[in-house]
Every structure is written in structure tokens, then in C-alpha cells.
Amino acid sequence: MTLLSTFDLTYPIVQAPMAGATTPELAATVSNFGGLGSLGSGTTAPDVLNEHINTLKSLTNRPFMINLMVLSEHDSNTLDSPTPAWLTKYYQEQNIEMALPKRPALSFAEQLQVLYDNPVPVASFTFGIISAEQVQRLKDLGTRVIGTANHPLEAKAWAEIGVDAVCVQGVEAGGHRGGWLPQSANDPMGLLTLISQTRACTDIPLIAAGGIMTGQAIKAIQTAGAELAQIGTAFLTTDTCGINDIYKQALLDASQDKRSSETRLTRLFSGKQARGLLNDYLRDFGQFEDVHNLPPYPQLNAMTNDLRAHA
């Protein structure tokens, strides 16, 4: 059975679940047109997540996907790294007040419980791996399960616990990289290489993500061995996307002017590798990218939250 039939899709397109950018309206629109609409919910409180699921169910009778970020209770509850001096100084220079939360991230366990209590057609996971028991519990509720991998070893690990598919995310992808093994950060692979090497070690159905914007690119990933294309950036400037108009205009400008379209892979926003447009913040503080004491995710993410909100 192909993923098109497994997920009951008309088109081989998955709208990427970009936390902070996707909305129930965007996901429902994509699903209603025959793709797999997705809602990035890793930063969504459990009660709001439940409301979003109910909204999606009211807007579409087609399959849709909820994506969560896998974090241990310790990581989501620990904020013990000192704020870097350069970041504190930047807040002061910009006259922005930093208000650190009591915990740097929401409880993954509580978010996952929402998916048990209010089952969804498809659930995907990033930043880590769940257990085989959790996969089976979701599948017993009728939920299809997708893992995320930046390295073949991660894809193989997902396959071994019984998921329905794995989204392999090449280094070209915008936003956060979803892998968790050291190899995925130390040896970033281009998408076609990642598909090829993953295909050599597992026959799990693959969804490809990373720099896909055209039908020709979709053909290329299908030829390489993936079945569906997960596309994010192309949806960011749509009416139902949740980012503000300034960000949307920056993306539109970048599509017209190569001088403003340079991207960079960085840990400076969240502590975890993510690709974004090169801006003054990255230019000014790129020298701190590889310092050994850069706070990890999600701690640095909490430290830069007010800065990103101000921007």
C-alpha cells in the first residue's frame, strides 16, 4: 500500500508542521485540497491543542496531522544554564525586557495525552523518538504515526518501533532540524543523499523534506525513493499562515532578490540547529555559534523568546 492510499491523499504533498506558523485553518485548507495538512503543536498548551484538534475536525473530514516535539520531562522542566553575556547585553541594547518562564518548554507527556484522549488521523514526532508502546497505543486508536530523521540511523530506529512512515529531512530544510542523534548534527546530509542512504538500510515508507518547492523537485525525491514531499516554506506566505506580515514580506523579498535570500544553519535562536534567513542577529553573534557553553534546547529557546516576540 502506498502512502497516498494510507493517508487517503489526492496529491503527494504534506504541508510541513511548522510550530508557531501553522494554524488549524491552514492545515484544514491543505487537507481539503487533497494534501496532508499539518499543525505544529510542540509549543501549544494541552488545552489549546485539544481546541485546535476540535477546530480541525470541524473544518475538514479529510486526514490531518498533529506534530509534537519529543522532550524528556527533565529537559522541558530544567532552566539551569546561565544566560550568555552577549545575549543579556543585546537585550539591554535593544531596550527589551527578558522575562524567563518557570520552565523552558511544555510537558510532552501532557501533550501526548491529548492525542490519546482526542485521537487524530496522523501524529508525527520530532526532536526525539517515542517508545514502541506509545506508537502502538496511538495506532490502536486509529492514528497513523510518522517519525522524523536527519540520519539513516534515526530512520532505522523509527522503523524498528513500528511507525507507518518516516520523514527524512535534508540539511536544505528551513526551520529546525528534527533529528536527535549526534550523527545528525555532526554529519548533516543533503536530502537526496539522505534518501539514498536511508533506503539502503530500511524499507520504511519515506516522506522527503528539505528545499522542495516545485513539481520537478517532487519528481526527483520520488525517483530517489521517497513517496511524499513535505513542503514548508511555500506555505508561509499564504493567507492562513500564522506568521506576521513582516516575516511574510521578508520571504517574498528573498524570493525576488538573491542578496536577501541567504540562509544559515544556526543554534543561536533556540540551542538546536535551525535554518533561517541571514539577519543582523546572526551576523552580529555568529562568532558564538560554536562556543562550548551555548545553552541547549529548549533553554536558549526560552531565553530568546522575548527577543523573537519583539522582532
State each model region's role.
Residues H176-I207, I212-A311:
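Conserved active-site-proximal phosphate/metal-binding subdomains
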Residues M1-C201:
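Active-site entrance/lid segments in N-terminal catalytic domains of soluble metabolic enzymes
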